[in-house]
Amino acid sequence: MLLRCEHLTVRRGKRDVVTDVSAELRAGEIVALLGPNGAGKSTLLDALAGALTPAAGRIERHGRVGIALQAPDLARRTVLANVMLALAWWGVPRAERGDRAREALRAIGAEHLASRPAATLSGGERRRVHLARAIAVRPDVLMLDEPFAGLDAEVRSNLLEDALSALRSSARATLVVVHDRAEAWALADRLLILLDGRLVASGPPRELLEQPPSVEVARFLGFDGRIEDGRELLLTRPAHIALDPVGPLAARVTRATPLEDGARLELALEHGRVYAVAPLPAPRPGEDVRIRIDGGARFPSGDRGNRGYQSLDRASASVQEGEPAGADQQAERDEA
């Protein structure tokens, strides 16, 4: 264990931005701190790095901590000189700085930029150099705040691929703040999910996706479909929903949003609403389709006061038998 915090609360002004967070970082792992804007991710990172004093709780650090802030600010020097400057601040002997800087630039795919003035770099190139500086100093714990922010999709994808191998180290723990789930999935061995300043989930990405611990975590992870029968709540992601001519559930397309290679469909069912991605030619709004549901997250119904619904299994059976959706059922779809 290289870093641990226990019951950490961090305050900005009179407001608690991070509340009662306990977590640890272990050598050899990349951990993504994931949450929406305003969740308190950067504040927690600053406190863990020692830049902010917590209002409560304790932090235990083993080894040196390096942090790369969100803005990739570079000095008016060459790229190589910028990385060497970071090494000088870190106390690396002068004789080692050149080789260490070139090694870090090579690891992040930026060796060809070494002689370029920093002022001539594109946004993606500046991000690469920013990461190279952080890697070059070889901290025991490396913290990165939104290292891929502000990049277009292609540049971000390329940088993610290079960063994954560059950040991997058996001797170092890496904590990366992100708000994009795709970035977390690409990088992390483990996720820490922060919502409203509270740590609400921790675990390997695939495990959290297969079995989110709560409704709020599921919704944050993209479970935007909802079917509820008064006894059980089923939340789904588009990947769980398949159009199937002989599927057990009847649905009506209420919205179709064009995508590059298909359409995102909003589908009204008897007891809720789900979303699916369909290839072209996709069904149009108003069309009736049949679907099957493969997976999803199940929770006890939190809406005990709803009108009595059939169980999901009975609903599936009745639709299979061809019972039409009446006016009352259509109204329920509209309310869902």
Predicted regions and their residues:
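Non-catalytic connector elements of ABC transporters
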Residues: 13, 233-336
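Helix-to-loop junction immediately C-terminal to a conserved catalytic motif
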Residues: 49
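Conserved ABC ATPase signature
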Residues: 117-121, 125
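ABC ATPase "signature
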Residues: 199-203, 211
